Amino acid sequence: MESTMSSASTNASPPSASEKHTPMMQQYLRIKAEHPETLLFYRMGDFYEVFFEDAEKASRLLGITLTQRGSSNGNPIKMAGVPFHAVDQYLSKLVKLGESIALCEQIGDPATSKGPVERKVLRVITPGTLSDSDLLPEKSEQPLLALYSTTQRKTITIGLAWLSMASGALKLMEFTTDARNAATRLKHELERIAPAEVLLPGSIDGPDSDYAFAKNTTVPDWHFDIAHGSKALHEQLKVSTLTGFGAEHLNAAIGAAGALLRYAQATQGKGLQHVRALTVETENEFIGLDAATRRNLELTETIRGQDNNSATLFSLLDHCRTAMGSRLLRHWLHHARRDQAVARARHAAINALMRTDACTGLASTLASVPDVERIATRIALQSARPRDLAGMRGGLQQLPSLRAYVSMCNQDADAPLLKTIHDALATPSECLDLVERAIALEPAAMVRDGGVIARGFDAELDELRGLSENAGQFLVDLETRERTRTGINNLRVEYNKVHGFYIEVTHGQTDKVPDDYRRRQTLKNAERYITPELKAFEDKALSAQERALAREKYLYDQVLQQMAQHIGTLQNIAHALAQLDTLVALAEHALRHNWCAPQLIAEPTIAIEQGRHPVVENHIERFIANDCLLNNESRLLLITGPNMGGKSTYMRQVALITLLAYVGSFVPATSATIGPIDRIFTRIGAADDLAGGRSTFMVEMTESAAILNGATENSLVLMDEVGRGTSTFDGLALAWAIARHLIDSTRSFTLFATHYFELTQLPEVHPSAANVHLSAVEHKDSIVFLHAVQAGPASQSYGLQVAQLAGVPQAVIRAARKHLATLEANSMQATPQFDLFADPDHLIPTSDVETAMAQPSALDEALADINPDALSPRDALDALYRLKELSNQHREK
């Protein structure tokens, strides 16, 4: 029996004199020293134990009991533990908290071990190296990324390598920049890739804010050696050159890949058989979307952050039946390709799917398909469980039906993408035959429980199972014979796990027991015996059961190894299934909501007829559709109108329709014609960055600067209320200058919403700008928003009416109306502010001052205080007499 007890005092960390510890604690401390930065889960029988500082940390994070056992240097050895069969739920919680865990397993036999059972860390679990379905989010990836940079003179080359352990997708990217732009450029790529864990050279001092959102892990600088990285890639991909991947000259990225592969292999404790291909991404491959744009357009998260109950573009479109399809849809939304041919191929496939009734059959069949992609990865890593293989079997059995449906859709249709998918869904007969013969129809959850290998697959296993399963009949026969032989009618032959097989006789009948009965256990009312015959059968039956489990484990491992030979085929099938599922989901949505196929052209234009916001239209009864036209003659639309009139919704819908067109989806419009787009920028909303020490206006200007420095003539820019975070004249001057820069210098397609009515004069001096407004109708003191975009500027903002709708007290509204009248009367007076944008002081006419300073009379105030809708007949009569009295007093003055 192993013990944590220490016969001599020790420290809580490895001491210089290890002999002061028990042999087991010496083993623990040695293994812990090899994994100092991880929580070491140390297997002891049916529990994983943690000790010392790890125990304190685990107790705090997991809410498990912290106890103590033995002592070290006069201090108790702190410990905590979790049951091995429930460890996944604890691992999941720790990983979500950004922790890494080393699983130290018993690999020796406790029955034959002299001293501590041999143990070894078989796997290290980190946020970026997960493959278990219980630890991963179903609909998103959690990639591991390595970053390496080199500097030559003033040029910085940044290499990125990232791996999705759960899918086996390995990607590289490299770009050059200068010191001033390096941080911004890197941040943009990290926001796009969204790694769960970032590997950094140890020479980097502390976490950089650009990648602090992920778990940062430092590894020795020499892990990033370029020569080693090149060799590692050649060995992993089984190639003699990287030229075919376009990666031969990406030295910084190759160095990052070397560190990445070394780390990933170390955490898994084995090779990465499922990493079989390499993709090189380039700077200009995707439509650029920074974090602000992804957030403002609410692609996969709402503006308020992660909220599973709120509507996003992803949640709207995710009709996918498989987790693979959902992950691919999410990827498409964040990685819209600039290449119009890619989107056109998807448009053609969706159109073909919509032309037949096959969508319903495809959807129902896909619903029976498991996560083939992640199961294939676990097969390659030899960590797949029996029910994974049963799921794979069920998924592969659906391939003929899916191919038939795809063929039906592709008849008389020009959809090459569907043809590619059809060909990839060919059934791997050898692989399917193996799993159908080998795995039971309803296997146990774990191999150790038995009942995993199907009957008839292995003769030796069937024989061993027969010995174990026939035990019941043998015991019945033995019980009958012994009752006859002894004359004891209530004699019973039974079995339990503690004492094995036995014959039970009540105390009143023990005098009839034959001489060959040997007492095994005494109970209060009975005696339990064993006979030579029963003992011989026990040895044979129990041995058969143990040997059957061992044989089953051996056979299962053999099946996994044979299945691993088909990983490449299974990965191709998984990718085809994901594409098909995503296209079917988009086709279903387009059919249900009357979306149209967009036209992608080479000329610069965004021409949308009767466009609608895809998410908003799904949540209101009637949505007002609007047009949008941007081209060489009209580069900027200046949008005015009331608060809540729909300006932001209109701007977002134009951006979403544009993005969806390049994603390859149909779009919510009557028609949409869109030219080349390289980036989409948004400057929407107002929020400060308290943690970063930035005010609302600083955030606004930082985002505006990123747009002005990064936008091109092929960019779509959304600017909402620029300049509102500072004084009126400062804000107006900045808004005017920014709008002019976007027209004159960048020539981006721009939607510019503002409440500065002075900006509506911009089209008079810039013909490529045009005024549009969101219309509204005022009725008495209320307002009705029409949400229709019309030509020309708005007449007013209706701010007080909106405040009234929001429930601002009537007294405040009345006071605001009075002050508004004063401000409007004083609108020609120059504001005494002094800054870079202020005009010289102007003389203020005395008459204007007198007008502005005039105070309303008591009669005016009394009249303004009256709310006719709130007066009873008697109150109205009293008010009328009061007004009459004030009027007479005013005339007397």
UniProtKB/Swiss-Prot annotation:
Q: Show the segment(s) annotated as Disordered.
A: 1-22
Q: What is this protein called?
A: DNA mismatch repair protein MutS
* Family label: Belongs to the DNA mismatch repair MutS family.
Bias (Low complexity) occurs at 1-17
A Pfam family (short name) is MutS_II
Q: Key word Translocase present in the record?
A: no
Q: Look up the record and give one Gene Ontology term from the biological process aspect.
A: mismatch repair
One Gene Ontology cellular component term attached to this UniProt record is: cytosol
Database matches in Gene3D superfamilies: 1.10.1420.10, 6.10.140.430, DNA repair protein MutS, domain I (3.40.1170.10), MutS, connector domain (3.30.420.110), P-loop containing nucleotide triphosphate hydrolases (3.40.50.300)
- The leader peptide range reads none
Q: Name one GO molecular function term.
A: mismatched DNA binding
Organism per entry: Herminiimonas arsenicoxydans
**InterPro entries referenced in this protein's UniProt entry, alphabetically:** DNA_mismatch_repair_MutS, DNA_mismatch_repair_MutS-lik_N, DNA_mismatch_repair_MutS/MSH, DNA_mismatch_repair_MutS_C, DNA_mismatch_repair_MutS_clamp, DNA_mismatch_repair_MutS_core, DNA_mismatch_repair_MutS_N, DNA_mismatch_repair_MutS_sf
What is this protein for, i.e. what is its function? This protein is involved in the repair of mismatches in DNA. It is possible that it carries out the mismatch recognition step. This protein has a weak ATPase activity.
* Record's keyword terms, sorted: ATP-binding, DNA damage, DNA repair, DNA-binding, Nucleotide-binding
Reading the lineage from the top rank, the first entry is Bacteria
Specify the taxonomic lineage.
Answer: Bacteria, Pseudomonadati, Pseudomonadota, Betaproteobacteria, Burkholderiales
Q: Which residues bind ATP?
A: G641, P642, N643, M644, G645, G646, K647, S648
